[in-house]
């Protein structure tokens, strides 16, 4: 294989909240790099997954769910999503087969009309509907936008993923290998660790603490015995939320720690001692300086 025919490019995954973008990314890359939760808007920064094969390198950008902003954090997420689309080689517009066409999709298709980037329609969760329904759904979308390819998949089950990856590679331009072969994301470990902790809090608190939570990593230190000490603070907006995150006699926080530790150990490949605190910072979502502390960098957007 001569290097001249090597292909590389950037692929953006967009769609309404909860269509399975993170599940797809994690299935393709084979590691838990995008936070997965069934609450809308759980992906906040541009998590990049890097897939390298003998013939190509695909850099996936997982944009926040496109939605009409409600506050500064929402504004921020919307801006990231739109700017990302201008810089990529291919856009994967993912929909949930069960939900069908909706207002949120109209909003996204409107944005796509102004772009020259090729767009694939990815119909996810096909294991949940009848094939006849699937064909009707595909027709519905085909009428509204000239998609280059339409690919039905199940990210969770892995159905049709290989076919999709081959089609993506066909659309990539020839180019260099941007990242080393063994690199799966360009986010530093500190960021991934904070996202893993955040994911556990979202899972365990359900609706009570939707997006009023950020995780700040205070320190990551290697110990003499080969283990790693991680200290992190979970930041909430109200005192009542602090009580929920800590739980009865600290039970919920303990469970967050237990689950997060298992994932962090898998990520780092060593034993981890995880220390967690909970802190209240009122209305952090509307304060830009605090957004910056939590890794939302304005200059990237």
UniProtKB/Swiss-Prot annotation:
GO terms for biological process: negative regulation of DNA-templated DNA replication initiation; positive regulation of cell division; ribosomal small subunit assembly. GO terms for cellular component: cytosol; plasma membrane. Residues 41-45 are annotated as: G2. Disruption phenotype: Essential in some but not all strains; in 168 / BR151 the null mutation grows slowly and forms irregularly shaped colonies after several days. In liquid culture forms chains of elongated cells with diffuse nucleoids that occupy most of the cell. Sporulation in this disruption strain is severely impaired. Essential in strains CRK6000 and IS75, where it cannot be disrupted. In CRK600 in depletion experiments cells become 1.5 to 2-fold longer and nucleoid distribution is dispersed. The number of replication origins increases, suggesting an increase in chromosome replication. Residues 205-282 form the KH type-2 domain. InterPro entries: G_ERA_dom, GTP-bd, GTPase_Era-like, KH_dom-like_a/b, KH_dom_type_2, KH_sf_prok-type, P-loop_NTPase, Small_GTP-bd. It is found in: Cytoplasm; Cell membrane. It is a peripheral membrane protein. Keywords: Cell membrane, Cytoplasm, GTP-binding, Membrane, Nucleotide-binding, Ribosome biogenesis, RNA-binding, rRNA-binding. Residues 124-127 are annotated as: G4. CDD domains: Era (cd04163), KH-II_Era (cd22534). Residues 153-155 are annotated as: G5. Monomer. Belongs to the TRAFAC class TrmE-Era-EngA-EngB-Septin-like GTPase superfamily. Era GTPase family. This is GTPase Era. The gene is era.
């Amino acid at each position: 294989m001569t290097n001249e025919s090597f292909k590389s490019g950037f692929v953006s995954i967009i769609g309404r909240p909860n269509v399975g973008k993170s599940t797809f990314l994690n299935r393709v890359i084979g590691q838990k790099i995008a936070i997965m939760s069934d609450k809308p808007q759980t992906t906040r920064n541009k998590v990049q997954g890097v897939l390298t094969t003998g013939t190509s390198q695909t850099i996936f950008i997982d944009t926040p769910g496109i939605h009409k902003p409600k506050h500064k954090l929402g504004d921020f997420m919307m801006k990231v999503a739109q700017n990302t689309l201008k810089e990529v080689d291919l856009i994967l517009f993912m929909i949930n087969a069960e939900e069908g066409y909706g207002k949120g999709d109209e909003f996204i298709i409107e944005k796509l009309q102004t772009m020259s980037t090729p767009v694939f329609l990815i119909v996810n969760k096909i294991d949940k509907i009848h094939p006849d329904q699937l064909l009707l759904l595909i027709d519905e979308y085909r009428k509204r936008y000239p998609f280059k390819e339409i690919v039905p998949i199940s990210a969770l089950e892995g159905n049709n993923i290989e076919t999709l990856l081959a089609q993506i590679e066909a659309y990539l331009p020839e180019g260099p290998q941007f990242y080393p072969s063994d690199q799966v994301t360009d986010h530093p470990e500190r960021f991934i660790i904070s996202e893993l902790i955040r994911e556990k809090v979202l899972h365990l608190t359900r609706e009570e603490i939707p997006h009023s939570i950020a995780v700040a990593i205070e320190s990551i230190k290697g110990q003499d015995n080969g283990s790693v000490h991680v200290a992190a603070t979970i930041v909430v907006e109200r005192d009542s939320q602090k009580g929920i995150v800590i739980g009865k006699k600290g039970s919920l926080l303990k469970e967050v720690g237990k689950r997060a530790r298992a994932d962090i150990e898998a990520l780092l490949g060593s034993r981890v001692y995880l220390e967690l605190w909970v802190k209240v910072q009122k209305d952090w979502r509307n304060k830009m300086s605090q957004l910056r502390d939590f890794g939302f960098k304005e200059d990237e957007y």
